[in-house]
Amino acid sequence: MSRAVVLCPGRGSYTEASLGSLDPDHEFVQIAEQCRGDLGLEPLLSLDRADRFEPARHLRPAHVSPLILVKAMIDAAAASEEHEVVAVGGNSLGWYIALCLAGSVSFEEGFRLVQRMSLLQEEHADGGQVLYPRVDGDWKPDPELEAAIEASLESSGGEAMRSIELGGFAVL
C-alpha cells in the first residue's frame, strides 16, 4: 500500500461541477443531514441534487462549508482505502476538515463545528482568521511570541479570539 498525504480543501472548492456528488447512503451524508435537520436547515442533498448551481444559494456559508466538509471527508475516506494516509493538512476550512480526518474530533463533532462557524459567519459577516506563529525556528514554544499573541487578544476589546492551536501556530 502506498503512503499518501491528504491536503484538505478550503472554501471555494464546491462548484457547479460538484453538483450530484453526494451519496445519500453514505454515513457522513446521513449524519450531516441529521445535524442540519436539528437546526432546521435545508438538506445538503437538496442542494447537491439541484438542477442547476445557483451561487446565491449554494455559496451561502451555511450551505457551502458543510457541503465542502462532507465531500472532502467522503473523498478522503475513499483515498484511505487505497493508501496509507501518513499526514493531513489544510488551509482555512481545510484545517477543520483535517481535524476530522486525523481523528482529533469525530465527523459529527467536526460537522457541528463547521456548521456553527458558517452560521456565525452569516450572522456577523465581517471577520477572518490570522495564523500566528507560537514557536521558534526549532519548533520550540517561544514565550515572546505567545506573549505577543496574548497582548493582541487583550487589546482587541473582545473582537479577536483564539480559535485553535494548529501545530506551531495560533489561529486567531
Model-identified regions with their sequence ranges:
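Short, well-ordered loop/turn elements at secondary-structure boundaries
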Residues: 1-2, 166
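Alpha/beta catalytic cores of group-transfer enzymes, especially the acyltransferase/condensing modules
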Residues: 102-172
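A short acidic, glycine/proline-enriched capping/turn motif at secondary-structure boundaries
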Residues: 75, 95-96, 138
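Conserved SAM-binding loop
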Residues: 89-90, 172
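Conserved active-site region of classical short-chain dehydrogenase/reductase
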Residues: 69-73, 99, 111
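Glycine-rich nucleophile elbow surrounding the catalytic serine of serine-hydrolase chemistry
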Residues: 90-100, 104-105
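Helix-rich "cap/lid" substructures immediately adjacent to catalytic or cofactor-binding pockets
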Residues: 2-89
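Short, flexible micro-motifs
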Residues: 12-15, 97, 106, 171
